[in-house]
Amino acid sequence: MDHLPMPKFGPLAGLRVVFSGIEIAGPFAGQMFAEWGAEVIWIENVAWADTIRVQPNYPQLSRRNLHALSLNIFKDEGREAFLKLMETTDIFIEASKGPAFARRGITDEVLWQHNPKLVIAHLSGFGQYGTEEYTNLPAYNTIAQAFSGYLIQNGDVDQPMPAFPYTADYFSGLTATTAALAALHKVRETGKGESIDIAMYEVMLRMGQYFMMDYFNGGEMCPRMSKGKDPYYAGCGLYKCADGYIVMELVGITQIEECFKDIGLAHLLGTPEIPEGTQLIHRIECPYGPLVEEKLDAWLAAHTIAEVKERFAELNIACAKVLTVPELESNPQYVARESITQWQTMDGRTCKGPNIMPKFKNNPGQIWRGMPSHGMDTAAILKNIGYSENDIQELVSKGLAKVED
């Protein structure tokens, strides 16, 4: 197979990934592949572009490094072109409502007839099967959080709150990426393709597991946090200093001992409630939990963030300032690791945003292209799989494909 024009880089160079999906979750999976060197083809509707394009800046990050194909994959010759593309594809990712592709005749079995080694990742809110009530429902970030038990655990004591920005979308997209790579590893061993059913609510169920396990195995439900503090453990979570906010984790025997000396609670060490060797102070079960919070709040409020960070570094207590977005760019760690970078958009502008992560030492990722326009690479992709200029024009004339104007 000849690949589309692009630089060769990253651990996934030579891999062809195709995705069909809008907004965040499914495309985020494709984005990870693209930043790690795979050739990634983004399928868009012919008549209506991906709704993400209405955003002014985010698409330049979320659709960089992609090849844009505008094709009606469910109808007539458009479907034929899509299936021909699948013959040269390693991984196909689709994000839709339940078994939408199967309902329209593109089943796993049809895809495997054209490519027995194909890895297929289906990403939906509620999965490919289940009850009629849920399976075909639309889902976004907040829907998956609400249905999974994740949302109810977040917020404050007075009200639950979703975790933003769009946590379920990103977790689900990354799950699709890792699952597809796991499947590809097995396919290369057996020669037999795989189909993956990723339900967003199940991803968030797994991500929300920490406190749920106490309920499933004892009936105890953890309360929601209060003012950003850990619902279980004192000295953990969000705290206010004299000039801003920090997060901290008071964990460890010596850390607790030394911190208690600073905040005037050394006399509690070695008591039945806080015996020697205590590594965590339970906010509820320990009768001194509220007192620890009161003393810690007072001590932190009397010190600046810089003073707290310096002292906690001496005590080996993990803490960090809560950075504002304007502070990120100039932070020395960000600068040293080039965590924020710039790249050129297709129309020649400069765009600034997060760099590629993680950092591969021997085969690093690369930003080689900004977001392509709607249908920008349709002709090149169709030619790559054997279509002539006349074939392409016929698809366009029938409204089954769109090429760049």
From Swiss-Prot:
GO terms for molecular function: L-carnitine CoA-transferase activity. It is an enzyme of class 2 (transferase). GO terms for cellular component: cytoplasm. It comes from the Bacteria. Its EC number is 2.8.3.21. Gene3D superfamilies: Crotonobetainyl-coa:carnitine coa-transferase, domain 1 (3.40.50.10540), formyl-coa transferase, domain 3 (3.30.1540.10). InterPro entries: CoA-transferase_III, CoA-Trfase_CaiB, CoA-Trfase_fam_III, CoA-Trfase_III_dom3_sf, CoA-Trfase_III_dom_1_sf. SUPFAM superfamilies: CoA-transferase family III (CaiB/BaiF). It is found in: Cytoplasm. GO terms for biological process: carnitine metabolic process. The keyword Kinase does not apply. CoA binds at K97, R104. It catalyses: crotonobetainyl-CoA + (R)-carnitine = crotonobetaine + (R)-carnitinyl-CoA; 4-(trimethylamino)butanoyl-CoA + (R)-carnitine = (R)-carnitinyl-CoA + 4-(trimethylamino)butanoate. Keywords: Cytoplasm, Transferase. Its main location: cytoplasm. Pathway: Amine and polyamine metabolism; carnitine metabolism. The active site is at D169. PANTHER family: L-CARNITINE COA-TRANSFERASE, SUCCINYL-COA--D-CITRAMALATE COA-TRANSFERASE. Homodimer. Catalyzes the reversible transfer of the CoA moiety from gamma-butyrobetainyl-CoA to L-carnitine to generate L-carnitinyl-CoA and gamma-butyrobetaine. Is also able to catalyze the reversible transfer of the CoA moiety from gamma-butyrobetainyl-CoA or L-carnitinyl-CoA to crotonobetaine to generate crotonobetainyl-CoA. NCBIfam families: PRK03525.1. Belongs to the CoA-transferase III family. CaiB subfamily. This is L-carnitine CoA-transferase. It comes from Escherichia coli (strain 55989 / EAEC). The gene is caiB.
